[in-house]
Amino acid sequence: MLLKSPPAWPAVSRGLPRARLVCPSRPPTLRLRRLRAAAALSEPPTFAGRYGKWTLTDNDRAEVLAYRAALNLLAFSFDAAAAAALLGDETTQQQVLNVASVGGVVGLGAALFLVRSAKRRGARTELLSHLVQVHMYVTPIKRFMQALWLAGTVGCVALAFTNADMPVATYVASHPQAVWLIGPVFAALTGLSFKEGACYGTPESVALFFAVPALLLGKLAGAPDDVEKLLLVVVALLLSVFALRKWTQPLQADIGDKSIFDFMALPPDEQQRREVELEKLERGF
């Protein structure tokens, strides 16, 4: 019986490792899956909203980071002013208080205001102006908070020009009735604290909602100096915790449900139609 010799390798394969011939390459489907996974990672995250899905864009991220940075500027400025008022001498107070006051007012204003660039829709252009990342769905409340901040800022500027020989904070400390001029700024901060506390339930936001008015009312009512100092320290600490903890929250938390904003931008007839469709879906029709 003759033994057959094993078949020779093709000429093109001579000199190549046998394992390379057995498994020439990874299956194309594996590479395709990896490409799809990489593409999915590069796409903006999608969230389910009340009126449909929405995505977190780069502009959204930039706005949230700007909002949180503005809150930290507000907190740092208030802390610096409180430290100068409680621990600094007259020279330090002259150097720090007005600068810190400007920083605090600017920080709160930056957290409340944003004028977005014009968006062209068809043949018309409309300018969208609203609160920044304080994404509140009731526009009159937004405008009211803006108006409070603006009124308090005007009061601060008026005090600075009429009493140029001393910082605004020093003048208010010795003239309690001046609280009525700067108070609207703190009222806007109180409203912001209420929004944050209602949305996220953070204890420092809830505490700020009560501590800030208590500080102003204590000054108006002529509270003892020790009580005023204690309230000042409490507000400074709460603001610091509030501003720093914002960095630990998910970015989409400060955006809100973008599908609601898109819905509110629709004409009333379209809003009603969408509501009817949503109600049918919820009922299973």
What are these regions (language model features)?
Residues 149-158, 206-219, 262-270:
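Small-residue-rich segments of transmembrane alpha-helices in multi-pass membrane proteins
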Residues 1-32, 37-40:
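N-terminal chloroplast transit peptides
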Residues 64-84:
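The first (N-terminal) embedded transmembrane alpha-helix
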Residues 180-186, 201-218, 230-241:
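Alpha-helical membrane segments in multi-pass integral membrane proteins
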